[in-house]
Swiss-Prot record:
Main function: A transporter able to export peptides and flavins. When overexpressed allows cells deleted for multiple peptidases (pepA, pepB, pepD and pepN) to grow in the presence of dipeptides Ala-Gln or Gly-Tyr which otherwise inhibit growth. Cells overexpressing this protein have decreased intracellular levels of Ala-Gln dipeptide, and in a system that produces the Ala-Gln dipeptide, overproduction of this protein increases its export.
UniProt keyword list: Cell inner membrane, Cell membrane, FAD, Flavoprotein, FMN, Membrane, Peptide transport, Protein transport, Transmembrane, Transmembrane helix, Transport
Domain of life of the source: Bacteria
UniProt protein name: Probable FMN/FAD exporter YeeO
Keyword Acetylation tagged: no
Assigned protein family: Belongs to the multi antimicrobial extrusion (MATE) (TC 2.A.66.1) family.
Transmembrane stretches, start-end: 94-114, 139-159, 174-194, 211-231, 246-268, 281-301, 318-338, 350-370, 404-424, 439-459, 486-506
Protein localization: Cell inner membrane
InterPro entries membership: MATE_fam, MATE_MdtK
One GO CC annotation: membrane
Single biological process term from Gene Ontology: FAD transmembrane transport
GO molecular function, one term: dipeptide transmembrane transporter activity
Length: 547
């Protein structure tokens, strides 16, 4: 036995037998040694053992052939040739921006989940009322976020050109205009709140409508604070400082949970305010966050964006305002129309019963958690693209957007497919109602099935907006939202009786149309139409003079 083992060792030490070519020999030698170690209980001539050994050898060889073929395919790709530069891009450009944004969004969503937990203990009607009111609040927040995006792009572009003054003016004027607009908007919505809830709630019960109206009237008071927090955070991100928004928004959401919990359920001998405490706690925490943003800008924590309180009363510069609005208005039209269409689909769901409303709300909350890395990469792509184009690096902007897109596609698909089997477990954190959990499980599995096209639908347009190509995204969103999500969702969900599954299939049809059109835009390079590439200089041949 020792002689055979030493022979095998000398054979494998030969430099000819390198990985993976040595593995079939190693497998054969191990099988032979196993025959001798058994104290001759099994003869080497035993035919079943020989057949089994040969079968395993063939399996190993076929697996090695497949792995070798895959390795050759990977080595022949463009990614493998530039893998070192992509690694540098990931760690130096993407990670410092995307990770704090991811943590900030995760904190916001997780605190939203905890807020839902706080309300869920008050009953299904309370949870459905919050869901209906928040579906309208999301329309307003989407508008603020779009102006925030315009501010982010202008700040990133201006600082790319080393123009700090323009970045400060853009931030200051965006804060002033959007705060005034938020006050006006809050007044109008508070006055017409009952009509808005009747329109949004559809066939919901009277109790659900009353709770939704109460929550809406309390949360509209926080609109000015939400506008200040969103736009100030966007300006800081455009300046490359993503840690301060993370700290402020994270602290804001933790305060929201603490304050709302105390106001809902009371403290010590005080019984609390019940359902009213949920909306009041959110409003108080948002104003604390707005004060923190204004303080950070006033003390100049980021030197590029030092804005004193007196400067908010200076005259407005309309040239910079129109530059911000040139990106913000198309993006806001896109966001408002998108969220309005989403609100309309919520109305389809509102007539399907309280269990379906609650299950749909929970499924959207879980899907938002799954999409967090993609949302962070989308925000990072906006900043990276704006910076690169600000210094005239057009080719780098194109390469980096492609890299972010594929990174998001592969990462989100893996996350969605790995978390889908645990949909029931995640739903149990929200509710113990079996009907609601059944709805959540079905919707999360559908979300995982269509996740490979999500990044093309959402990450790519975020990068396009960094190149100030916002109008194309606006028209595509209008077409896909109203032509697919609303129409297909109504046909499948209401007319054909598919229920909430049909409404979600309309959403996936919206994703598919957006993915095709945005991917075509990226491949053709038309999203860089505002940045013409310099034409290569032609070398003119000098005429030969004959003597």
């Amino acid at each position: 036995m020792l002689r055979h083992i030493l022979t095998a060792k000398n054979l494998l030490s030969n430099p000819i037998f390198k990985f993976p070519n040595c593995l079939p020999f190693l497998s054969t030698v191990c099988c032979i040694c196993r025959q001798f170690v058994g104290e001759n209980l099994c003869s080497f001539a035993d035919s079943p053992s020989l057949f089994e050994m040969w079968f395993h050898f063939l399996q190993l060889r076929s697996a090695l052939n497949i792995s070798s073929a895959l390795r050759q395919v990977v080595h022949g790709t463009r990614w493998h040739a530039k893998r070192k530069s992509y690694k540098v891009l990931f760690w130096r450009e993407i990670t410092p921006l995307a990770v704090p944004i991811f943590m900030e969004n995760a904190c916001v969503l997780l605190m939203g989940v905890l807020s839902t937990f706080l309300v869920s203990w008050l009953g299904k009607d309370a949870m459905a009322g919050v869901g209906l009111a928040d579906s309208f609040n999301m329309v307003i927040m989407a508008f603020f976020a779009a102006i925030d995006l315009g501010t982010t792009v202008v700040v990133a572009f201006s600082l790319g050109k080393r123009d700090r003054r323009r970045a400060r003016v853009a931030t200051r004027q965006s804060l002033v205009i959007m705060t005034l607009f938020a006050v006006l908007l809050a007044t109008l919505i508070h006055h017409f709140g009952e009509q808005i809830i009747d329109f949004v709630a559809g066939d919901a019960t009277t109790e659900v409508k009353a709770l939704a109206l109460t929550y809406l009237e309390l949360t509209v008071l926080s609109y000015p604070a939400a506008a200040i927090t969103l736009i100030g955070s966007g300006a800081l991100r455009g300046a490359g400082n993503t840690k301060i928004p993370l700290l402020i928004n994270g602290s804001l959401n933790i305060l929201n949970i603490i304050i709302s919990g105390i106001l809902i359920y009371g403290l010590f001998s005080w019984p609390g305010l019940g359902f009213v405490g949920a909306g009041l706690g959110l409003t108080i925490s948002r104003y604390i966050g707005a004060v923190a943003i204004l303080w950070v800008l006033a003390i100049g924590f980021n030197p590029a964006l030092r804005i004193s309180l007196k400067s908010y009363f200076k005259p407005l510069n309309f040239s910079i305002i129109w530059e911000v609005m040139g990106i913000g208005i198309p993006a806001s039209v896109e966001s408002v129309l998108f969220t309005s269409g989403r609100l309309l689909t919520q109305m389809f769901v509102a007539g399907m019963g309280t269990s379906v409303i609650a299950g749909n709300f929970i499924a959207f909350s879980i899907a938002a958690l799954i999409n967090l890395p993609g949302s962070a990469l989308g925000s990072a792509s906006t900043i990276i693209t704006g910076r690169r184009l600000g210094v005239g690096q057009i080719a780098q902007a194109e390469i980096q957007l492609r890299h972010v897109f594929w990174l998001s596609t592969l990462g989100l698909t893996a996350i969605a497919w790995l978390t889908a089997p645990f949909a029931g477990v995640m739903a149990s954190f929200y509710t113990q109602d079996p009907q609601v959990k059944h709805v959540v499980v079905i919707l999360i599995w559908l979300n995982a099935l269509f996740m490979p096209i999500w990044s093309a639908s959402w990450v790519l347009p975020a990068g396009f907006k960094g190149a100030r190509d916002a109008r194309y995204a606006m028209w595509v969103s209008m077409l896909s939202m109203w032509g697919c999500r609303v129409v297909v969702g109504y046909v499948l969900g209401i007319m054909l009786g598919w229920g909430v599954v049909g409404v979600w299939m309309g959403m996936f049809a919206d994703w598919a149309v957006r993915a095709v059109l945005f991917y075509w835009r990226m491949v053709t390079g038309r999203w860089l139409w505002k940045y013409p590439r310099p034409e290569p200089q032609k070398c003119e041949k000098k005429p030969v003079v004959s003597e």
